[in-house]
């Protein structure tokens, strides 16, 4: 099992897919990495040589921000927006959607479970 950037890559998947298990690497970025290192997209993780694994590791460490570094940068960006008091920072602080989505209905992922409040009872 190949281990890159602290992530165990699945053995039986194609490299194009296996690299997406690293936080910050999607399909497109995965294809760019493989093209730059000269490794086939269709090669399986279990068939990688140690040389190829070290080549991948060197390329990713040298050119990309992934895993912990990327997570820290995203958190720092959110903290900065909260501190400067911009609209996006206020939305983050209140736990509401940041990018203009509606909140009258939906937005349950950000707002959490519904809190039932006592309302008017129906007249019979």
From Swiss-Prot:
A single GO molecular-function term is: rRNA binding
Sorted alphabetically, which keywords does the UniProt record give? Answer: Ribonucleoprotein, Ribosomal protein, RNA-binding, rRNA-binding, tRNA-binding
Highest taxon in the source lineage: Bacteria
Q: What cellular component terms from Gene Ontology apply here? A: cytosol; small ribosomal subunit
Q: Which PROSITE patterns match?
A: RIBOSOMAL_S13_1, RIBOSOMAL_S13_2
Stored SUPFAM superfamilies: S13-like H2TH domain
Which GO biological process annotations does it have? translation
Region listing for Disordered, in residue ranges: 97-124
- Chain's role: Located at the top of the head of the 30S subunit, it contacts several helices of the 16S rRNA. In the 70S ribosome it contacts the 23S rRNA (bridge B1a) and protein L5 of the 50S subunit (bridge B1b), connecting the 2 subunits; these bridges are implicated in subunit movement. Contacts the tRNAs in the A and P-sites.
Record family assignment = Belongs to the universal ribosomal protein uS13 family.
List the HAMAP family: Ribosomal_uS13
Subunit and interaction comment: Part of the 30S ribosomal subunit. Forms a loose heterodimer with protein S19. Forms two bridges to the 50S subunit in the 70S ribosome.
| PANTHER family referenced in this protein's UniProt entry, alphabetically | 30S RIBOSOMAL PROTEIN S13/40S RIBOSOMAL PROTEIN S18, SMALL RIBOSOMAL SUBUNIT PROTEIN US13M
Query: What is the protein's name according to its record?
Result: Small ribosomal subunit protein uS13
């Amino acid at each position: 099992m190949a281990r890159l950037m602290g992530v165990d890559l699945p053995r039986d998947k194609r490299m194009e897919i296996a690299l997406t298990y690293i936080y910050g690497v999607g399909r497109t970025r995965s294809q760019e990495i493989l093209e730059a290192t000269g490794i086939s997209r269709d090669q399986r993780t279990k068939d990688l040589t140690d040389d190829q694994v070290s080549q991948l590791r060197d390329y990713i460490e040298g050119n990309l921000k992934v895993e912990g570094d990327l997570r820290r940068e995203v958190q720092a960006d959110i903290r900065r927006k909260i501190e400067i008091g911009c609209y996006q920072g206020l939305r983050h602080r209140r736990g509401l959607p940041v990018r203009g989505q509606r909140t009258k209905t939906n937005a349950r992922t950000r707002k959490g479970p519904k809190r039932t409040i006592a309302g008017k009872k129906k007249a019979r």
